């Protein structure tokens, strides 16, 4: 039962992380297309946003391991 719960948690986190990354990157590209002079600042903010979005699957992985070993 724990393995199924861990798999579902990881699947949800992976889907959420992928969608979140796609949204962050697409908005950054839209901003660069509108204001190319801000590309450096937008790129920096995009990397910070992607890092924050990717924290969720990592946390879900740790929780999934804890659920499996319980």
Swiss-Prot record:
Topology class, membrane: Multi-pass membrane protein
SUPFAM superfamilies in the record: F1F0 ATP synthase subunit C (SSF81333)
Keywords for this protein: ATP synthesis, Cell membrane, CF(0), Hydrogen ion transport, Ion transport, Lipid-binding, Membrane, Transmembrane, Transmembrane helix, Transport
Main location: membrane
Stored CDD domains: ATP-synt_Fo_c_ATPE
Keyword Cell membrane assigned: yes
Subcellular compartments: Cell membrane
Transmembrane spans: 4-24, 47-67
NCBIfam families assigned: ATP_synt_c, PRK06876.1
Subunit and interaction comment: F-type ATPases have 2 components, F(1) - the catalytic core - and F(0) - the membrane proton channel. F(1) has five subunits: alpha(3), beta(3), gamma(1), delta(1), epsilon(1). F(0) has three main subunits: a(1), b(2) and c(10-14). The alpha and beta chains form an alternating ring which encloses part of the gamma chain. F(1) is attached to F(0) by a central stalk formed by the gamma and epsilon chains, while a peripheral stalk is formed by the delta and b chains.
Function text: F(1)F(0) ATP synthase produces ATP from ADP in the presence of a proton or sodium gradient. F-type ATPases consist of two structural domains, F(1) containing the extramembraneous catalytic core and F(0) containing the membrane proton channel, linked together by a central stalk and a peripheral stalk. During catalysis, ATP synthesis in the catalytic domain of F(1) is coupled via a rotary mechanism of the central stalk subunits to proton translocation.
Protein name as it appears in the record: ATP synthase subunit c
Lineage of source species: Bacteria, Bacillati, Bacillota, Bacilli, Lactobacillales
């Amino acid at each position: 039962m724990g393995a199924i719960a861990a798999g579902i948690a990881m699947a949800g986190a992976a889907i959420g992380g992928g969608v979140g990354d796609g949204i962050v990157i697409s908005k950054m590209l839209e901003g660069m297309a509108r204001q190319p002079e801000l590309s450096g600042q937008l790129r920096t903010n995009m990397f910070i946003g992607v890092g924050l979005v990717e924290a969720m699957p990592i946390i879900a992985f740790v929780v999934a391991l804890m659920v499996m070993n319980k």
